[in-house]
Amino acid sequence: MITVSKDGCGDFTSVSEAVKHASANDTIFIKKGIYRERVEITAPLTFKGEDAENTVIEYGMYARMPMGNEKTGTFRSYTMLVNTDGFQCMDLTIANTAGFGKDVGQAIAVYAEGDNIRFENCRILGHQDTLFTGPLPFKEIEKGGFRGPTEFAERRFCRQYYINCFIAGEVDFIFGSAAAYFENCELFSIDCGNEINGYVTAASTYEGQAYGYVLNRCRFTGNCSDNSVYIGRPWRDHAQTILIDCKIGNHIRRELFHDWNKSSAHDTVNYGICGTNADPSELPDFVRIIDRTEADFILKSITEQ
């Protein structure tokens, strides 16, 4: 085990330095402290924080920040980049401290691209585009929009797991194409003072993929005004987001999902709920009620993979 400690009592004082010296499948234990740095992981490692609230990796890059002769852009703004299969992270906070989206644009805390990635008992904090669950969609909408570490990577099926995590943000703060499973997570929407305060998810699930986002026993909380946040909208037309036994706060819009003004997506998205405290009569026609049999099948399919 490699130990990181700011007081010099470990093997390294920097998480990035520990990563550089680690071998595949090593465990890096990170002692309490605020580590202001960007961390890039390209090998299957395990991160274990001493305490989730008091072991913090933070940085403050953002999309509108100048980088050479251009802007940083969304996908180079990350605090932590996970570009490998089989990474695990436990008991740690990863934050992008750049600030509100209206001021700085997108600012990723965790950029996760790879299969069998797992975050457990973690806090992932940001504002706009907090957590990117890669891979990217097949094509960008604007030229150069995907500039970043996996711009030219193979677009492939990637499974990710977020267990007992606290994830905070405002606009599209969980987004991407992964098959991502969230269990017993708290998804906290930050008030940004608008009539519509934001969107929790923006999936870009690939056409034909078995599932996109599945949220099981999660809690949607926030400090926003009532009826001001959507649970999701489709970043791409085949977005999938399924809610099973989730608890929805009063800040969530009664219709739950927005179509991002894409009427064509009504026939292609897969938005569904089961056992969730929402009024079915308020749901738009592109959101369906899932019965318990289908919900159990979805959960079984995920756990058996």
Short names for language-model regions:
Residues M1-Q305:
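Sequence-level preference for short, compositionally simple segments enriched
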